[in-house]
Amino acid sequence: MVSTVFPHDFLWGAATSAFQVEGAYNEDGKGLSLADLRSMAIDPAEEPTKALANVGDTLADSRVASDFYHRWQEDLRLMKELGLKSYRFSIAWTRIFPNGDEAQPNAKGLEFYDHVIDRLREYGIEPVVTIYHFDFPC
């Protein structure tokens, strides 16, 4: 039997995408992404007003997801307790540039990710950031 040993610096970890975990789809200046619209089954070309409105329960998946946006401190604490050495996550483009074409980034979005990265480092968890994970701005 062959024994496989992982290197001592192997990054055991977890991974998520912003759309799948963050929720808070319309908070702190975040814009709608194509993934948000797909979850609503709305064609922005046909229904632009409805696409930009708060459409209630039809946006359940991206509206709440696992609520990482509000529960990130607890979630990262649990990752630390698990002994994870890395966390690969994506940054929601629409949280930084809500419409995708702003000259200045959304300060609240930057602040959120700064806090997440700072806490990961505090816990000794290596942040591995994906800039784009299927959440192109509308």
Show where each model-derived region lies.
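Mature N-terminal, pre-catalytic/accessory segment of carbohydrate-active enzymes
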Residues: 1-12, 18, 65
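A common structural microfeature
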Residues: 9-11, 69, 86
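Charged catalytic carboxylate motif
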Residues: 13, 71, 112
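Short, solvent-exposed loop/turn elements at domain surfaces
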Residues: 20-25
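Aromatic- and acidic-residue-enriched carbohydrate-binding clefts of CAZyme catalytic domains
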Residues: 28-63, 101-107, 135
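Substrate-binding cleft and catalytic face of glycoside hydrolase catalytic domains
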Residues: 46, 74-138
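Asp/Glu-centered strand-loop micro-motifs enriched in Gly/Pro and often flanked by an aromatic residue
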Residues: 56-81, 101
